[in-house]
C-alpha cells in the first residue's frame, strides 16, 4: 500500500538505492552535438568564438544511464569529461528560421560528453574526431527531462561537474554563444529533426 503522506511530501515511494536509473531517452534518430559553444570555453582553448555552430555527432547507442559505468577503452590514455546541457526535441521540424526553433523544443536534460582526447586531438582517424567522441558508453545522460515550461530562464542555468567530490567545471548557460532555439533551427537546415532527437550543447569552462 502506498503511503499517501510520502507522496504528498514529494518523497520517493521506492528508495533510490533500490532502483536503476535509465537514460531519460533511449530511442532516437540523431544525437547532434555542438562544439565551442560557451564563451568561457573558447577563451580557455585560446580560440575565437565560431561564426556558426560547430556540429559533430555521437551515436545514439553511446547513451547510458546517469549512474552506469563508463568503459575506459584500452586504445586511449586520455579519457575526459564535459558537462553538457541537452535539448530534447518534441516534434518534427525542417528548414526553420531561428525564431521558430523554440517551437520544436520539448525540454532539457543533462549529459556528460565523455571524450578520448588522444583520438579527438590527433591525426588518428584522418583528423576527424568522431571516434574520440563516440566510443561505447561515452554519453551518460539524465536521469530526468525537465519541460521547457518548467524552466524560468534557460539562459541562466548553472552547469557543473564534480569528479571524486572535487568540482572540475563551473559555468552558466548565459555563456552560450548560440542559444538552444538557434541550434535547433541551424541543424534543421541540413537534416530533418524528429521528436526525441537530442542536441548536446558544448562544454563549459573548467
Model feature map: region roles:
Residues 11-15, 41, 117-206:
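Catalytic-pocket segment enriched in acidic/His residues
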Residues 1-53, 149, 160:
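N-terminal non-catalytic cap/leader segment that marks the start of a structured domain
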Residues 38, 92-94, 204-206:
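Short, charged beta-turn/beta-strand-edge "cap" motif at the junction between a beta-strand
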Residues 89, 96-111:
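RNA pseudouridine synthases
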Residues 21-23, 44-46, 70-79, 84-85, ...:
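A generic local secondary-structure boundary/capping motif
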Residues 49-66, 81:
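Structural signature of FAD isoalloxazine-binding scaffolds in flavoprotein oxidoreductases
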